[in-house]
């Protein structure tokens, strides 16, 4: 199913989803598009710039120092290091690995009360995203489904990821005040 999931088609693609039970959303973040920058495979660099609300040009040299190339992209295990070097004093970068292990739904909802999250995913379970980084800005919990609300770097509007179908191979990165 290689179709972008959004508010416009969620009821069509998930007709038995039921009612929205609760939502957690950040409203003070601007979406960034990868096409607005010069690199290829720069989804992680774009996502970090979006989350930290800093210039792409400030993130790129640090990402390059940690192995980013336009041919291979960014090693997901280095995202926390890149974020730590680019955030202002008084903050610390954090990471969690594996859906249901370090990255539970409860943890996502707790973090999203204060800050957006960089999600490095291997596969979204719907064959739309593969080996891609997005910015999580919300969680929508329905009677029969849970969806991550994301900026994917390809669209200005939010897209949705079916949390239940998300691959266990993934990690999240965010910042907290010290």
Residue ranges and their predicted role:
Residues 1-72, 142:
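Active-site-adjacent structural segments surrounding the nucleophilic cysteine of cysteine proteases
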Residues 54-56, 61-178:
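Conserved active-site-adjacent core of cysteine acyl-enzyme catalytic domains
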């Amino acid at each position: 199913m290689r179709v972008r999931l959004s508010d416009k088609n969620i009821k069509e693609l998930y007709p038995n989803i039921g009612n929205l039970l609760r939502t957690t959303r950040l409203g003070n973040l601007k979406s960034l598009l990868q096409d607005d920058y010069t690199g290829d495979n720069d989804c992680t660099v774009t996502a970090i710039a979006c989350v930290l609300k800093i210039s792409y040009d400030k993130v790129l040299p640090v990402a390059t120092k940690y192995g980013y190339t336009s041919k291979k992209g960014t090693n997901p295990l280095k995202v926390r290091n890149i974020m730590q070097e680019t955030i202002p004093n008084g903050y610390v970068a954090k990471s969690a690995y594996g859906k249901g292990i370090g990255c539970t739904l409860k943890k996502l909802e707790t973090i999203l009360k204060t800050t957006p999250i960089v999600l490095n995913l291997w596969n979204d379970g719907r064959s739309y995203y593969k080996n891609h980084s997005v910015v999580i800005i919300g969680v929508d919990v329905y009677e029969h489904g849970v969806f991550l609300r994301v900026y994917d770097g390809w669209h200005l509007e939010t897209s949705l990821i079916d949390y239940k179908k998300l691959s266990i191979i993934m990690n999240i990165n965010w910042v907290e005040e010290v």
